[in-house]
């Protein structure tokens, strides 16, 4: 996935103000939704290319097509994309590559693969975005479609290839500012809006039988299970980093002790008129420790934060339904006692 956007010369992005909002055509949304739900039935990650154009500060997505699912390593995915876009151009369809999309499970899309892929896209196609579609949340009746772009700090960090704690502090990068969410709007043609209005009149009225359905059977369970897994991963990263700090502290202590001993020996040599030993002879015995990669821990922290927000939102809605149910039950019992 990381080499799918390498057909353009890489260039550095200096500003995150290239795109102010994303406007997505209704047909493109339907094609993305259809593809993501088809792949979710097989527990696979759906991915595809976004086509459109940039008008002022607006990125218009007018079409899309899925990436091929093939186990053949000899298949040239880049050539496949170029062939599809060339054929779309022949039928007068927008063929400019403006990003990519992928499905999301349990409402969490932040991952190392997403970061790497978007970096290659954004450094080769400046205006590119990644659109994430949450299949699970959308299946409950809430269309969840979000567009993201890497922040300049994240691009600079990934370009330098330095994921040490010092690099994160210098660039002020955290899980909350790895990606910047871009507002996305869905636009339909006037004829489509007229047809939807007519279809809305033909639909039966919702009697609200499922209004108070808590629906906690699978949603909360999946969110909690994923949250526990991410917390375990973050704990392992914390243990690994603590061991690194302990080794560094032990090495520094031994180095200071050796330097102090050398200083005392050099003082004796000086008093005897003998040449002193330079400190470099001691320092080079202690090789600097390689700092652990903190990008994985940062991404895991972002996943934990996302799961916690989803759980809090879901629980607040469920509590509201519980209070409403309690009030209705009390009113019903009071009416029956009369």
From Swiss-Prot:
Would the keyword Cytoplasm be found if you checked this record's keyword annotation? yes
Query: Which InterPro entries is this protein grouped with?
Result: eIF3h, eIF3h_C, JAMM/MPN+_dom, JAMM_MPN+_peptidase_M67A, MPN
Outline the extent of the MPN domain.
22-154
Tree of life domain: Eukaryota
Example of a GO biological process term: positive regulation of Notch signaling pathway
Q: Listed GO molecular functions? A: metal-dependent deubiquitinase activity; metallopeptidase activity; translation initiation factor activity
Q: How does it assemble?
A: Component of the eukaryotic translation initiation factor 3 (eIF-3) complex. The eIF-3 complex interacts with pix. Interacts with mxt.
Protein's name according to its UniProt entry? Eukaryotic translation initiation factor 3 subunit H
Look up and give the organism this protein is from. Answer: Drosophila melanogaster
């Amino acid at each position: 996935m990381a080499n799918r956007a390498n057909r353009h010369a890489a260039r550095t992005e200096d500003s995150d103000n290239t795109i102010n909002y994303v406007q997505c055509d209704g047909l493109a949304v339907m094609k993305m939704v259809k593809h993501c739900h088809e792949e979710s039935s097989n527990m696979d990650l759906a991915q595809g290319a976004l086509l459109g154009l940039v008008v002022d500060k607006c990125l218009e997505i007018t079409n899309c097509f899925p990436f091929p699912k093939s186990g053949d390593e000899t298949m040239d995915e880049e050539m496949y994309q170029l062939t599809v876009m060339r054929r779309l151009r022949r039928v007068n369809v927008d063929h400019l590559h403006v990003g990519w999309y992928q499905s999301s499970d349990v409402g969490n899309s932040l991952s190392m693969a997403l970061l790497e892929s978007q970096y290659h896209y954004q450094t080769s196609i400046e205006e590119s975005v990644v659109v994430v579609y949450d299949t699970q949340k959308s299946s409950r009746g809430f269309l969840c479609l979000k567009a993201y772009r890497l922040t300049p700090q994240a691009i600079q960090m990934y370009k330098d290839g330095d994921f040490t704690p010092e690099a994160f502090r210098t660039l002020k990068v955290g899980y909350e500012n790895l990606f910047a969410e871009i507002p996305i709007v869905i636009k339909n043609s006037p004829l489509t809006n007229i047809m939807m209005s007519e279809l809305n009149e033909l639909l039966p009225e919702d009697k609200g039988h499922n209004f108070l359905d808590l629906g906690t059977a699978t949603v909360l369970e999946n969110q909690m299970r994923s949250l526990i897994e991410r917390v375990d991963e973050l704990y392992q990263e914390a243990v690994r980093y603590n061991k690194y700090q302990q080794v560094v502290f032990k090495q520094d202590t031994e180095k200071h002790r050796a330097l102090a001993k050398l200083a005392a020996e050099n003082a004796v040599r000086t008093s005897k008129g003998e040449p002193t030993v330079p400190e470099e002879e001691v320092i080079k015995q202690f090789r600097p420790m390689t700092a652990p990669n903190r990008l994985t821990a940062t991404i895991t922290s972002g996943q934990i934060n996302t799961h916690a927000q989803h759980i809090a939102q879901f629980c607040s809605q469920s509590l509201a339904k519980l209070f409403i149910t309690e009030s209705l039950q009390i009113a019903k019992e009071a009416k029956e006692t009369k």
